[in-house]
């Protein structure tokens, strides 16, 4: 009887550990919560945007800010409070992300190509605690012309020459 209880408890412990390992493995797959807005004028061929990532931890990898900046320029678009202008998403809409999911999975993986199109302006991150979450902000320059050319050459979006 005692041997059966030990085996039963052992199986329960193994099952619980397996569940926690699986949950931990998918923690990085969670969609990012972020906001993006225009921050001013960048050099020709770039957008200057302020990205705010909303998460439970106060520490953030700089690459996550860059990823959100490129993702926001591609699929969300942004508006500027100062110039009262709106930039449409470079890729057109979120449907493009779903249609070309294989391409964007590789593009946005850790250390993926997206990193070539975003540069942090300054070294500092602004961290503000609001309730149980942190809002971590930074200004990022996104190379929109180079990003556009990359997507056209990959066949993700149609270039201007194809429309006429």
Residue ranges and their predicted role:
Residues 14-19, 60-61:
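Residues at the start of alpha-helices and the adjacent loop-to-helix junctions
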Residues 2-16:
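Bacterial N-terminal signal peptides that target proteins for export
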């Amino acid at each position: 009887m005692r041997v059966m209880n030990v085996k039963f408890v052992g199986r329960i412990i193994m099952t619980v550990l397996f569940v926690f390992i699986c949950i931990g493995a998918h923690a990085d797959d969670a969609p990012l919560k972020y906001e993006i807005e225009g921050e001013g004028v960048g050099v020709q061929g770039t957008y200057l945007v302020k990205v705010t990532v909303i998460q439970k931890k106060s520490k953030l990898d700089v690459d996550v800010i860059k990823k959100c900046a490129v993702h926001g320029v591609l699929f969300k678009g942004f508006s500027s409070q100062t110039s009262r202008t709106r930039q449409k998403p470079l890729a057109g809409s979120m449907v493009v992300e779903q249609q070309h999911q294989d391409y964007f999975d590789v593009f946005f993986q850790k250390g993926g190509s997206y990193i070539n199109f975003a540069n942090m302006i300054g070294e500092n991150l602004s961290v503000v605690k609001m309730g149980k979450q942190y809002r971590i902000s930074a200004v990022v320059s996104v190379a929109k012309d180079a990003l556009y050319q990359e997507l056209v050459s990959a066949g993700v979006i149609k270039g201007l020459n194809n429309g006429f």
